[in-house]
Regions:
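Conserved, mostly hydrophobic/aromatic
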Residues: 85, 146, 216, 259, ...
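N-terminal glycine-rich anion-binding loops that anchor highly charged ligand groups
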Residues: 70-87, 91-110, 114, 119-122, ...
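Thr-biased low-complexity repeat/linker tracts and other Thr-enriched repetitive architectures
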Residues: 683-714
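N-terminal amphipathic alpha-helix/helix-capping segment at the start of soluble metabolic enzymes
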Residues: 35-87, 204-210, 346-409, 641, ...
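Catalytic alpha/beta core domains of metabolic enzymes, predominantly
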Residues: 182-200, 226-389, 473-478, 484-488, ...
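C-terminal accessory/binding modules appended to enzymatic or scaffolding proteins
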Residues: 385-413, 421, 631-676
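N-terminal chloroplast transit peptides
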Residues: 1-24
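Active-site beta->alpha loop and helix N-cap motifs at the rims of alpha/beta catalytic domains
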Residues: 58-64, 93-96, 107, 111-244, ...
Length: 743
């Protein structure tokens, strides 16, 4: 059957709510359409060779971007120093004793710098006592004042703290109203700079006089109305917003500052930092970067999103300080911070990389997901091979012979539903499995378990040698590229399909011949000591030049005993660092002795964090700070218990309104602390419930109040009803009943 492909790439500019993902294309003329393919958007954009702008020292190896040194008390930040670790307190800043105790706990856990929210004069006065007490207790850890809306407060606290963080989105413009403001005349837009300079200059001069540092920290969700009107909530707007303030600093010969470009969406975050670095190269600037994914959430999901954003930038040599923002106690942020920093430093010190090549695949200004071809059904197939891959991103699981000894347990670990003991694919079921060894033909029970998986679309992949030793009907053979080329590019006898195993060290000539191989997918598994990010970029570029559209899954392996956080951090940094560029169609994580269910959920977490495939409710929850108006961890867990079964729905849980409404750009619904003792509920950025006391809640549709006085103890129920009213609710599935398996 002749195969043809409609288009070779799709592009989307990242901005608010950018959820368009382009990937697999249906094959024209295929006898049977690929699953879910009819709904795919056809975007006809020609492939072009890209002149990749310089945003890092090298796209072929990890080399630290050279920066000046910024002094923050006793801590030096910049490329000549190790990556500094940061966190932020969650106590009420006015509670001096509690804040001092938490700062000490964070410093003892490894924090180099600690940020404290300072929202008013009372908090600023408390900061004097906090700094004084910490010095008395022998702690000289630098403190950073987190300032929003209050230039006068920033002037006060600069007397006490070593660094001031200002948000360009609200420092001079005041509190956000999300009103649309149109500047038809560019001169009018430029005239507003004078107001910014008038408000900001006194702080610049004071920091310069006292030797204080500053972070110009743009947040994707809290850009000023003026910037939004001109640039939209785009990475370009984020960078321009920061540069307006940096220009004022430079005008007064003040250079002791760093930049940050935070967003809750890792793709937006990565693009913004790359653009920031690119523009600094163009201007000849060398200011350090503080990295962070804001509102990352908690647990494994929060660590994964942070690793995707922070880790991918560290692999390009970007980043001088980092913070992993988790909805957990701040000292728990230190472990993932250390793991990420160590990963970046190792990549730099060991010179991870590949020989230079001409890169034509990536575009750092837009998100472009590489297009692959889904498997097609063939005449005579006894099994349906279309579900072998998933159009939004594929997850494979590595299964051992020992796993087959308990079939029902295996089915559950693969995420399958059980009906009368029989497996059926669910929304988060592994798409296919990989086995290094196959059961002998005499092992009827194990082979029956595999057959049941095959019959519901969970296909079995195995090395060609293993398949030759123990033939399995319908199995997919795995061969190296060299083996496949030597075999004429066809699947070996006894195999229904062929999968390629790549390791990133293949020659240019071998990769140029990949199109001649009739394979349904390739597994890319780089060996130890080889940079996965850089070698994979080379492979994808070579595959593109060869004219092949073979889907590629990242196969990452870990040694026995690897800590779970290490699995998450490295997977997010190495594989997520490729998926944010659209390079890859899924993942398989293999770790000897590790729980299969953990590896599967981590793989799906990787795809969801990379904005590819949603299999569970997405939570955008802030890490809490002194502004937080309720117990974030407790409330987030309450909401998760009631809404965690809604794949495709994103819910923001924000402690206050500083960034809350804005950072909900990617969320469908929001639960935000509006004032002490009050909660606001949102649909998108539209308030639908506002001013709800802790013992009551108000409801809004658009920006119009429609209900007031809902008791706090029913706040989660009000959120559930809001989801139902907007047609996004589904009932919880019935629990499985244990049933005997038919022989």
């Amino acid at each position: 059957m002749q195969r043809s492909v409609a288009s070779s790439r799709g592009q989307a500019q990242l901005g608010a709510g950018s959820r368009q993902l382009y990937g697999f294309r249906q094959i024209k003329g295929a006898r049977l359409a690929a699953p879910m393919q009819a709904a795919a958007t056809e975007l006809m954009i020609p492939t072009i060779d890209l002149d990749l702008p310089k945003y890092c020292e090298s796209v072929h190896q990890t080399r630290r971007r050279p920066t000046r040194t910024v002094t923050i008390g006793p801590v030096k930040v910049g490329s000549q120093h190790r990556v500094a670790l940061q966190t932020m307190t969650t106590t009420d800043t006015r509670d001096v004793a509690a804040t001092v105790a938490q700062v000490k706990k964070c410093a003892d856990a490894g924090a180099d710098i600690v940020r404290i929210t300072v929202q008013g004069r009372k908090e600023a006065e408390a900061c004097m006592k906090i700094r004084e007490q910490l010095f008395k207790d022998g702690y000289d850890v630098p403190l950073v004042a987190d300032i929003h809306f209050q230039p006068a407060v920033a002037m006060m606290v600069a007397e006490a703290f070593e660094k001031i963080r200002i948000n360009p989105g609200n420092f001079a413009d005041g509190r956000k109203t999300f009103e649309e403001i149109n500047y038809d005349d560019p001169a009018e837009f430029e005239a507003e700079r004078a107001h910014i300079e008038e408000v900001f200059t006194p702080l610049v001069l004071k920091c310069k006089e006292l030797g204080r540092a500053m972070r110009i920290g743009t947040n994707h969700g809290s850009l000023s109305a003026r910037i939004l009107s001109f640039y939209g909530d785009t990475p370009k707007g984020m960078v321009e917003s920061a540069f307006e303030f940096a220009d004022i600093c430079r005008k007064h010969d003040y250079h002791n500052f760093v930049f940050s470009m935070k967003a809750s969406n890792p793709l937006v975050m990565v693009q913004a930092y790359r653009l920031l670095a690119e523009e600094q190269y163009k201007r000849g600037w060398d200011y350090p970067l503080h990295l962070g994914v804001t509102e990352a959430g908690e647990g494994e999901d929060g660590r994964m999103k942070s690793a995707i954003g922070i880790g991918s930038l560290l692999m390009d040599g970007l980043g001088d300080t980092i913070r992993v923002s988790l909805t957990e106690d701040p000292e728990y942020e230190m472990d993932p911070c250390k793991r990420l920093a160590s990963l970046g430093e190792t990549a730099c010190s060991e010179g991870w990389g590949v020989p230079e090549f001409s890169e034509t695949t990536r575009d750092t200004h837009t998100f472009s997901r590489r297009v692959g071809v889904l498997p097609e059904q063939r005449e005579g197939d006894e099994l349906d091979f279309r579900p072998l891959l998933h159009r939004d991103g594929t997850v494979f699981s590595a299964v051992s012979l020992a796993d087959l000894k308990q079939p029902e347990a295996l089915y559950r670990k693969l995420g399958a539903k059980l009906v009368v003991g029989m497996p059926f694919k669910d929304i988060a079921t592994s798409d296919s499995i990989f086995m290094r060894q196959l059961p002998a033909e005499s092992d009827a029970e194990a082979r029956r378990a595999l057959r049941r998986l095959q019959e519901v679309g969970v296909h079995v992949l195995a090395p060609a040698a293993a398949l030759a030793a123990n033939p399995l009907p319908g199995a997919v053979a795995v061969m190296t590229l060299a083996e496949a080329l030597a075999a004429g590019g066809k699947a070996p006898a006894g195999a229904s399909r062929l999968t390629l195993s790549l390791n990133g060290t293949e020659s240019d000539d071998q990769l140029a011949a990949i199109k001649s191989v009739d394979a349904v997918v390739a597994l890319l598994d780089t060996p130890d000591g080889v940079s996965r990010v850089h070698s994979s970029r080379r492979v994808f570029d070579a595959i593109k030049r060869a004219g092949s559209e073979i889907p590629v899954l990242h196969h990452i392996r870990f040694a026995a005993g690897t800590h779970r956080d290490e699995v998450v951090i490295k997977t997010g940094s190495w594989v997520g660092g490729l998926l944010v560029d659209g390079l890859g169609d899924g993942a398989m994580i293999e770790a000897e002795g590790e729980d299969l269910d953990f590896l599967r959920t981590t793989s799906f977490g990787l795809l969801q964090g990379s904005r590819m495939r949603n299999v569970k409710t997405e939570y955008v929850s802030c890490p809490s700070c002194g502004r937080t108006l309720f117990d974030l961890q407790e409330v987030t867990e309450q909401i998760r218990q009631k809404t965690g079964h809604l794949p495709g729905v994103a819910i923001a849980v924000m402690g206050c309104i500083v960034n809350g409404p804005g950072e909900m750009a990617d969320a469908d619904f929001g639960y935000v602390g509006g004032a002490p003792g009050k909660i606001d509920l949102y649909v998108g950025k539209e308030v639908v419930q506002r001013g709800i006391p802790m013992d009551s809640i108000d409801l809004y549709v658009g920006k119009e109040v429609v209900q007031r006085g809902i008791p706090m103890d029913s706040a989660c129920d009000a959120l559930v009803q809001l989801i139902k009213d907007n047609g996004r609710w589904v009932d919880l599935p019935e629990p499985e009943e244990a049933q005997p398996v038919a022989a």
